[in-house]
Design a protein with these regions (language model features):
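Juxtamembrane intracellular "pre-TM" segments in multi-pass secondary transporters
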Residues: 1-7, 188-219
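Cytoplasmic helix-loop-helix junction between adjacent transmembrane helices
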Residues: 103-141
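Helix-loop-helix hairpin linking two adjacent transmembrane segments in secondary transporters
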Residues: 96-101, 129, 138-184
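C-terminal ends and interior cores of transmembrane alpha-helices
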Residues: 81-96, 287-299
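C-terminal membrane-cytosol helix-exit motif in multi-pass small-molecule transporters
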Residues: 173-195, 383-388
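Intracellular juxtamembrane helix-capping segments at the cytosolic ends
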Residues: 31, 113-127, 317-330
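Hydrophobic core of transmembrane alpha-helices in multi-pass small-molecule transporters
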Residues: 18, 99-114, 303-317
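Helix-to-loop junctions at the C-terminal end of transmembrane segments
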Residues: 59-72, 264-277, 361
């Protein structure tokens, strides 16, 4: 495949990621508040957001199988069709004021996300080994566009029409249709038929792959990134509402948070190449610890903006670091099962944490939600330090 075609694919994946992330950030901005208004039991207010991660975790392995069977282009097109259904069901749930239908619509967005999680790996597959971390970073950087588009689309649409928020979720349909058009233009290389003996064809057992220290750190880094980020994003709109901030303030905070998540992606790949993946992961953990300190020391608007921006930075370093590390631990024939296991585990952890976020907030408040994250961060920090001390050199 020619170099121009390879990077054209990366650009198309960047655009389709931007469209999905716009829909995702819109939903993250609004679903906690919508859930709070619609749920009879306020402990379930964050259930719609938790259902996004349930949908993602449930789709990770099926999506991997589908992508391998019908190809990445057709598989990604199928994902956007699920996105259309997500917008339709969520919109209908709001029109009918049905909390459970609305939650199903959010779960379908998670299923769509199950396909989009493979965009970064498709980009890595499309370029030479030396450029993999840059390709991953670039696709994830699409969130910078979504950082502006998502919250502003939420602000613009939430009060349109007779039923608040209905048009916000209807816009997901339009975004998904646009994404369908973009991914239909992909020209991804077909899977290579791998040779001969049974061991080479099947690769190592998954159990053997996940015993690798790099696999453990890659998995732990991504899981920590998503659990901490998910808890922060899920509870921030509700916490700000509880502290008496204006109704449009959470959208601004989420916007800065998403900028923190995705803006560094333009240079994270280069930082990994210069300083090594272990140092980037270590820095990401320190940033998440700093987030907790800022979050629990005040509930003003500045605290929320600063804390959420920093948790975004930490997420970026941990997620891109973990993803880059993961691409080095599997052989080509082991790619699908390793990627699927990684993302299934990550989003299962995020789903569980998001499900309990509302109950944690109602019972222990904003500080309690954040302090409960400390043990996970400490464990990840210890593993990262051990890997750094072992002085394992990997060429990125």
């Amino acid at each position: 495949m020619k170099t121009t075609v390879k990077w054209n694919n990366v650009w198309l994946l960047f655009l389709s990621q931007a469209l999905f992330q716009t829909a995702s950030i819109l939903v993250i901005t609004l679903s906690g508040v919508v859930g709070l208004q619609m749920a009879a039991d306020k402990n379930l207010a964050t259930l719609p957001i938790a259902m996004i991660t349930v949908g993602t975790a449930s789709m990770m392995i099926p999506a991997s199988i589908i992508l391998k069977k019908i190809g990445q282009r057709k598989g990604f097109m199928l994902g956007t069709i699920i996105g259309v259904l997500s917008g339709l069901v969520s919109w209908y749930g709001i029109i009918q004021q049905s909390f459970w239908i609305f939650s199903v619509g959010n779960m379908l967005l998670g299923a769509y996300q199950g396909f989009t999680q493979y965009y970064r790996f498709a980009a890595a597959d499309a370029v030479p080994d030396a450029a993999k971390s840059k390709a991953i970073s670039f696709v994830i950087a699409a969130g910078v566009i979504a950082a502006f588009a998502g919250p502003n689309l939420a602000k613009f649409t939430q009060h349109l029409g007779a039923v608040p928020y209905a048009y916000s979720y209807f816009s997901i349909i339009l975004l998904s249709i646009l994404a369908f058009g973009v991914v239909s233009l992909l020209k991804l290389q077909k899977p290579i038929n791998l040779p001969t003996n049974g061991t080479a064809k099947k690769g190592r057992p998954l159990k053997e792959i996940i015993k690798n220290k790099d696999t453990i750190l890659a998995l732990l880094s991504s899981a920590t990134a998503f659990v901490v980020m998910g808890m922060a994003m899920t509870t921030t709109p509700i916490a700000m509402h509880g502290f008496g901030h204006p109704s449009d303030s959470p959208a601004t905070v989420i916007q800065w948070h998403v900028l923190g998540m995705f803006l560094p992606s333009f240079f994270t790949g280069m930082l990994i190449q210069k300083f090594g993946v272990y140092r980037i992961i270590f820095t990401g953990i320190l940033l998440l610890l700093l987030y907790i300190i800022i979050a629990v020391t005040g509930n003003g608007f500045t605290n929320f903006v600063t804390a959420l921006f920093i948790v975004g930075l930490g997420w970026n370093f941990l997620f891109i670091g973990g993803s880059s590390l993961l691409t080095k631990v599997y052989r080509p024939e082991e790619k699908e099962k390793t990627q699927a296991f990684n993302d299934f585990t990550v989003f299962t952890a995020m789903a569980i944490s998001s499900f309990f976020a509302g109950s944690l907030y109602n019972n222990f408040g904003w500080n309690g939600v954040n302090l409960v994250l400390l043990p996970l961060l400490i464990v990840t920090l210890i593993v990262a330090i051990r890997m750094m001390k072992a002085d394992i050199k990997t060429d990125y």
